[in-house]
């Protein structure tokens, strides 16, 4: 090894002491070391690599492995040096981690400070690089005996069931045509219309339709259109001008003034469902009793979901307030970027990212201590419950999961969080609190 070794460096007695290291700085979890490898070692390894390459090297005019060695050196020296440098960095960095007893680390960064010029005669400069990394923090184990949570249970009353049934009447009205020719359309009525829209006397794309159904007050058309239809009668025709919003999604129409002509072909009003049993049958139930049972199940499911989210937030708040340890800044920075994409804002994004990283590390430590592992079903449940929708089929999400490592880590983290929190909530002390459905909704609305 070259004698050109930095002062205060520690020489490592491994593989003929191929490297020395010097501590540059340690700040909480951040570590920086300077590693020096003798030029003689690099030169020997490069020569060995070139000899390996020469066995199969090809060049026009020469058979495989028969290229003159000086041509091998000329054509492959840089490639060999790159290979040796990378493998040396891998070995020395890994060996140093063992020496300084760093069990795990995050995002190591290498900055090459100097490379030996192997073309120089005489003593050559050493290979020197800086290794920067963050070590994993010592994460405490969650103490279940110290956690006390509130388990909120909702009491479903007849009033709640009636409110649910009434909401069905509002959401799924049955419409009938109006026979009275003098009837004037009002908010909530369904109109069957023909319409045309023109800009500078030219019909624009999507600006006309026949027998189009629109419910007044639904906001189906641009602002002001449905207001113009209010008060019209069956068979009546009307023309009016409206201006498209400046931020309208179709750029060619944004901010443009259009002339509309509308004819009302029919006016339909919401029909009274009649008796409860008749109403239940119209929306697919055997009788009113079946509908009420369905309502109770739906309300119960909604209350259970709100209850679970409330107790989960209470647990998260407790862990965030009662456990403190150094967090790796690179991990927090990455999570902060994800938070900003989710929320569309930088406000409090750092604080939220720190909270998420802290909880994730607590859950990871807890899962190791309590031997909680993920199954394929745990992963699939997260994919199905959080990522599948009418517009995003399972096959597309699962294909993305298999091909994207970052998405895999995200889904696995969510699955582990769910499994660990469920385990903790099941084991800790819980005080039951009975509330009304309205009170539960208010509690949920405040989180």
Swiss-Prot record:
A molecular function GO annotation: peptidyl-prolyl cis-trans isomerase activity
A single Gene Ontology CC annotation of this entry is: cytoplasm
Record's SUPFAM superfamilies? FKBP-like, Triger factor/SurA peptide-binding domain-like, Trigger factor ribosome-binding domain
List the disulfide bonds in this chain: none
Q: Respond yes or no to whether keyword Chaperone is given for this record.
A: yes
InterPro entries xref list:
PPIase_dom_sf (IPR046357), PPIase_FKBP_dom (IPR001179), Trig_fac (IPR005215), Trigger_fac_C (IPR008880), Trigger_fac_C_sf (IPR037041), Trigger_fac_ribosome-bd_bac (IPR008881), Trigger_fac_ribosome-bd_sf (IPR036611), Trigger_fact/SurA_dom_sf (IPR027304)
Reactions this protein catalyses = [protein]-peptidylproline (omega=180) = [protein]-peptidylproline (omega=0)
Sorted UniProt keywords: Cell cycle, Cell division, Chaperone, Cytoplasm, Isomerase, Rotamase
The EC number(s) attached to this protein equal: 5.2.1.8
Residue ranges of domain PPIase FKBP-type in the record: 188-273
Q: Does the keyword Cytoplasm apply?
A: yes
Any matching Pfam family:
Trigger_N
Which subcellular locations apply to this protein? Cytoplasm
Q: Set out the biological process GO terms recorded for this chain's protein.
A: cell division; protein folding; protein transport
UniProt domain comment: Consists of 3 domains; the N-terminus binds the ribosome, the middle domain has PPIase activity, while the C-terminus has intrinsic chaperone activity on its own.
Main role? Involved in protein export. Acts as a chaperone by maintaining the newly synthesized protein in an open conformation. Functions as a peptidyl-prolyl cis-trans isomerase.
Q: Which family does it belong to?
A: Belongs to the FKBP-type PPIase family. Tig subfamily.
Q: What is this protein called?
A: Trigger factor
Question: Which lineage is the organism of this entry classified under, starting from the top rank?
Answer: Bacteria, Pseudomonadati, Pseudomonadota, Alphaproteobacteria, Rickettsiales
């Amino acid at each position: 090894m070259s004698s050109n070794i930095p002062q205060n460096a520690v020489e490592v007695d491994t593989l003929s002491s191929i490297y020395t290291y010097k501590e540059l700085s340690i700040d909480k979890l951040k570590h920086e070391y300077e590693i020096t490898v003798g030029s003689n070692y690099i030169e020997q390894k490069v020569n060995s690599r070139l000899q390996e390459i020469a066995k199969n090297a090809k060049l026009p005019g020469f058979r495989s492995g028969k290229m003159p060695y000086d041509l091998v050196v000329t054509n492959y020296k840089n490639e060999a040096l790159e290979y040796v440098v990378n493998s040396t960095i891998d070995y020395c960095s890994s060996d140093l981690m063992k020496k300084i007893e760093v069990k795990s680390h995050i995002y190591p960064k290498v900055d090459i400070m100097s490379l030996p010029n192997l073309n120089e005669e005489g003593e050559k400069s050493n290979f020197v690089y800086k290794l920067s990394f963050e070590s994993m923090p010592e994460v405490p184990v969650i103490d279940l005996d110290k956690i006390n949570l509130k388990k909120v249970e909702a009491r479903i009353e007849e009033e709640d069931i009636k409110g649910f049934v009434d909401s069905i009447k509002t959401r799924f009205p049955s419409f009938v045509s109006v026979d009275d020719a003098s009837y004037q359309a009002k908010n909530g009525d369904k109109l069957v219309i023909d319409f045309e829209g023109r800009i500078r006397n030219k019909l624009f794309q999507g600006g006309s339709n026949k027998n189009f159904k629109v419910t007044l007050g639904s906001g189906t058309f641009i602002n002001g259109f449905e207001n113009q239809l209010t008060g019209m009668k069956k068979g009546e025709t009307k023309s009016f001008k409206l201006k498209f919003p400046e931020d309208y999604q179709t750029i060619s129409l944004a901010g443009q003034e259009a002339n509309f002509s509308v004819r009302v072909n029919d006016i339909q009003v919401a029909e009274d469902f009649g008796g409860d049993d008749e109403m239940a049958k119209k929306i697919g139930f055997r009788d009113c009793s079946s509908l009420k049972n369905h309502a109770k199940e739906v309300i119960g499911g909604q209350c259970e979901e709100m209850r679970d989210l409330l107790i989960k937030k209470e647990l998260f708040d407790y862990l965030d307030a009662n456990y403190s340890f150094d967090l790796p800044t690179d991990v927090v920075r990455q999570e902060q970027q994800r938070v900003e994409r989710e929320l569309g804002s930088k406000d409090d994004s750092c604080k939220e990212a720190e909270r998420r990283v802290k909880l994730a590390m607590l859950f990871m430590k807890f899962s190791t201590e309590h031997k909680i592992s993920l199954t394929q079903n745990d992963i699939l449940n997260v994919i199905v419950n959080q990522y599948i929708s009418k517009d995003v089929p399972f096959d597309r999400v699962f294909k993305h999961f298999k091909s994207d490592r970052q998405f895999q880590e995200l889904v696995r983290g969510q699955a582990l969080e769910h499994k660990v929190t469920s385990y903790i909530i099941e084991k800790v002390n819980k005080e039951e609190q009975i509330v009304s459905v309205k009170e539960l909704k208010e509690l949920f609305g405040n989180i």
